[in-house]
């Protein structure tokens, strides 16, 4: 009796439904892994930390990492404290928001100017074509935080507000909208700095308005100009030289907000 020929497994043609299912499962696995990473980051890092001695930075790098150890030493000549933010892609906006509102607790004149500009900002965005219904809740949260400062809240209570996920994220969304609005209003100027053949509007839709998109020079310039708040960023990376590189946005202005930038991340600095 002749041996039975082994049955050949029927192969699915390329581009079949099974391939699509495999791709979907792969995508879902990646998303699940990313969610786990984000959850781990969230557990380990508050949205905005307590104020810490700047010396905590030394422990984040190996003792023989001479480049960073030297740059931290240089930074220590100019600043005494740091307040860390969660590395979630929204750190620039959160750091800016907390730093400036905290400073306004001791600057009533700037508080009134900032409140007036912020109150009018929704009207400016609507006049540009942003939908009032869409942005209203975010603007209300922004104004609520400013009014909390106006009532002389404590730093601890302001910090609690910034560590409330929904409040903090609504603030970030609104600051992103303000950044987008300014870039689009001044599109003739900013179009020269955008790569990839994109329009300013496309850049804003892809790189500014979505949550968790990291920020660069162009975002900082736009937000500083939109709210007339000067920002000084100390850049610390592996570049040569034992000092951090300070940049003031806009150039020549008197800084109100001080931030530390390490590749992909912003924290708050204090003199």
Swiss-Prot record:
Catalytic activity, as annotated: Thiol-dependent hydrolysis of ester, thioester, amide, peptide and isopeptide bonds formed by the C-terminal Gly of ubiquitin (a 76-residue protein attached to proteins as an intracellular targeting signal)
GO molecular function, one term: ubiquitin binding
UniProt region (Free ubiquitin binding), positions on chain: 189-195, 214-221, 245-251
Tissue: Isoform 1 is ubiquitous. Isoform 2 is expressed only in lymphoid tissues such as tonsils, lymph nodes and spleen, as well as peripheral blood mononuclear cells.
Outcome reported for the amino acid change (mutating residue 134 to R): Impairs inhibition of UBE2N/UBC13
Alphabetical list of Gene3D superfamilies matching this protein: Peptidase C65 Otubain, subdomain 1, Peptidase C65 Otubain, subdomain 2
Matches recorded under Pfam families: Peptidase_C65
GO CC field: cytosol; extracellular exosome; nucleoplasm
Subcellular location: Cytoplasm
Phosphoserine modification, residue list: 16
Biological-process GO terms, alphabetical: adaptive immune response; DNA damage response; DNA repair; negative regulation of double-strand break repair; positive regulation of TORC1 signaling; protein deubiquitination; protein K48-linked deubiquitination; proteolysis
PROSITE patterns, A to Z: OTU
Active-site residues (renumbered): 88, 91 (nucleophile), 265
Keywords: Acetylation, Adaptive immunity, Cytoplasm, DNA damage, DNA repair, Hydrolase, Immunity, Phosphoprotein, Protease, Thiol protease, Ubl conjugation pathway
Chief site of localization: cytoplasm
Domain OTU: 80-271
Ubiquitin-conjugating enzyme E2 binding: region residues: 130-138, 169-177, 206-213
Post-translational modification: Phosphorylation at Tyr-26 by SRC and SRMS promotes deubiquitination of RPTOR via a non-catalytic process.
Regulation: By free ubiquitin: binding of free ubiquitin triggers conformational changes in the OTU domain and formation of a ubiquitin-binding helix in the N-terminus, promoting binding of the conjugated donor ubiquitin in UBE2N/UBC13 to OTUB1.
Site (Required for proximal ubiquitin-binding): 23
Similarity annotation: Belongs to the peptidase C65 family.
Known function: Hydrolase that can specifically remove 'Lys-48'-linked conjugated ubiquitin from proteins and plays an important regulatory role at the level of protein turnover by preventing degradation. Regulator of T-cell anergy, a phenomenon that occurs when T-cells are rendered unresponsive to antigen rechallenge and no longer respond to their cognate antigen. Acts via its interaction with RNF128/GRAIL, a crucial inductor of CD4 T-cell anergy. Isoform 1 destabilizes RNF128, leading to prevent anergy. In contrast, isoform 2 stabilizes RNF128 and promotes anergy.
Subunit organization: Interacts with FUS and RACK1. Interacts with UBE2D1/UBCH5A, UBE2W/UBC16 and UBE2N/UBC13.
Name the UniProt record assigns to this protein: Ubiquitin thioesterase OTUB1
Lineage, highest ranks first: Eukaryota, Metazoa, Chordata, Craniata, Vertebrata
Gene name, Swiss-Prot/TrEMBL: OTUB1
């Amino acid at each position: 009796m002749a041996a039975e020929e082994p049955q050949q497994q029927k192969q699915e043609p390329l581009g079949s439904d099974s391939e699509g299912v495999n791709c979907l499962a792969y995508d879902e696995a990646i998303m699940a892994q990313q969610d786990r990473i984000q959850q781990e980051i969230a557990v380990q890092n508050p949205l905005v930390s307590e104020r810490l001695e700047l010396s905590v930075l030394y422990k984040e790098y190996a003792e023989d990492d001479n480049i960073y150890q030297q740059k931290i030493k240089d930074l220590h000549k100019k600043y005494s404290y740091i307040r860390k933010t969660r590395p979630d892609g929204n750190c620039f906006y959160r750091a800016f928001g907390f730093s400036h509102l905290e400073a306004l607790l001791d600057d009533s004149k700037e508080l009134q100017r900032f409140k007036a500009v912020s109150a009018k900002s929704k009207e400016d965005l609507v006049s540009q074509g942003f939908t009032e219904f869409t942005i209203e809740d975010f603007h209300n949260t922004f104004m609520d935080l400013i009014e909390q400062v106006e009532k002389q809240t404590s730093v601890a209570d302001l910090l609690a507000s910034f560590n409330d996920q929904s409040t903090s994220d609504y603030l970030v969304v609104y600051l992103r909208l303000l950044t987008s609005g300014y870039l689009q209003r001044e599109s003739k100027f900013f179009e020269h700095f955008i790569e990839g053949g994109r329009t300013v509007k496309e850049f804003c839709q892809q790189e500014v308005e979505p949550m968790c998109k990291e920020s660069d020079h162009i975002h900082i310039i736009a937000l500083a100009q939109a709210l007339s708040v000067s920002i000084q960023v100390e850049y610390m990376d592996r570049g040569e030289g034992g000092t951090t590189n300070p940049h003031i946005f806009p150039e020549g202005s008197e800084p109100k907000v001080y931030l530390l930038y390490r590749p992909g991340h912003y924290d708050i600095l204090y003199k």
